[in-house]
Amino acid sequence: MAAPTRSLRRLSSFRTTISPSLTVTAPIGCRSYATTDSSSATNTPGTTRRRATKFQDKLNAGPSFSDFVSGGQDEPLDPSEAYALKTALVGPAGRKKEMTRLPEWLKTPIPDSKNYQRLKKDLRGLNLHTVCEEARCPNISDCWGGSDKSSATATIMLMGDTCTRGCRFCSVKTSRAPPPLDPHEPENTAEAISRWSLGYVVLTSVDRDDLVDGGARHFAETVIKIKQKKPSMLVECLTGDFRGDTEMAALVARSGLDVYAHNVETVEELTPFVRDRRATFQQSIRVLDSAKKAVPELVTKTSLMLGLGETDEQLWDALRQLRAVNVDVVTFGQYMRPTKRHMAVHEYVTPDRFELWRQRALDMGFLYCASGPLVRSSYKAGEAFIENVLKKRRAGSGTAERTVDQTAATTDEATR
């Protein structure tokens, strides 16, 4: 009987060591709660309420839930207040940094519509990629969220989702040795587009410097497949620079497409700091020039990002060089930093400035200019004005079908 006695003594000593004010409220062997003598498990009528914290005071002083849901602002803000940039302190205590918050005019809704989910399902089923997703485009809810597929625009990204270049503004994955091309991609792309009652489609791609032709023949084959399935479809190709090989740019231009697009991205002075070292402003100019010379009636198009630190003089010079090679369409959009690993935003350009540059571009003789904070190179590419211009040019030229046949024969011969 000595062992139980020692155990009880040990328990008694342990209880005293913890706190002399603790009281065990149940026999040994039963689970129980230990409380201090000065407190009680139940509130007495005379117990005072806990004093409100500073956090509660801030909540009570702020807007109500109904104000939060409705936005709290019934009257529109004046331009000076609407365009004002706000800052916030972020980070752990002692290491907080001041960051500029995203302006109100750059905020977009989260995509969740049924049409968005339907388009995404179709693309996944055919193993296709879109630049809308890979480049985290802020307009995806607008372009994919129409009430039906005919009002939607999806920019198909050919040749996989991995690029061989690493531009400092782009969030697309990079690798020196991306996966090989999918030989069924041109047919799958044409099949996906035929399912949607679209009148205009945009094809783009990652840069494939690992391929001899840079993927030019893959582009041409995809355009040919689409035109075979739906000749009335208007096709825009947003290509890379093919390492400056103007013959490959001309090959794509002759494939039967309607708009040849290649983005210079920024002004010439900032190109070495923004784009991959293998890309130059003059190389892009030569690509656009070769496409126009290959098919003079072809609409050529490019895009520039603002907010990277460019000056007005540099923008003027870039536009003059683009007009010198007869580029028809130019777009301006705000650069938005995809992640902290990418180059920082130098300036958030206001909508008024975008409108000013739109007017300047039109005054210089550009056929069309889309300019705004959320505008991207393929955003609303098939607007009625461009579609009407393309249809008029197509009606006035009888060479479109012959060009497609000639390019198809050239592509087949090169493949063999």
Curated annotation (Swiss-Prot):
It is an enzyme of class 2 (transferase). Residues 396-416 are annotated as: Disordered. Residues 405-416 have a biased composition (Polar residues). The keyword Cytoplasm does not apply. Its EC number is 2.8.1.8. One of its GO terms (molecular function) is metal ion binding. It catalyses: [[Fe-S] cluster scaffold protein carrying a second [4Fe-4S](2+) cluster] + N(6)-octanoyl-L-lysyl-[protein] + 2 oxidized [2Fe-2S]-[ferredoxin] + 2 S-adenosyl-L-methionine + 4 H(+) = [[Fe-S] cluster scaffold protein] + N(6)-[(R)-dihydrolipoyl]-L-lysyl-[protein] + 4 Fe(3+) + 2 hydrogen sulfide + 2 5'-deoxyadenosine + 2 L-methionine + 2 reduced [2Fe-2S]-[ferredoxin]. PROSITE patterns: RADICAL_SAM (PS51918). [4Fe-4S] cluster 2 binds at C163, C167, C170. Residues 148-367 form the Radical SAM core domain. It comes from the Eukaryota. Belongs to the radical SAM superfamily. Lipoyl synthase family. This is Lipoyl synthase, mitochondrial.
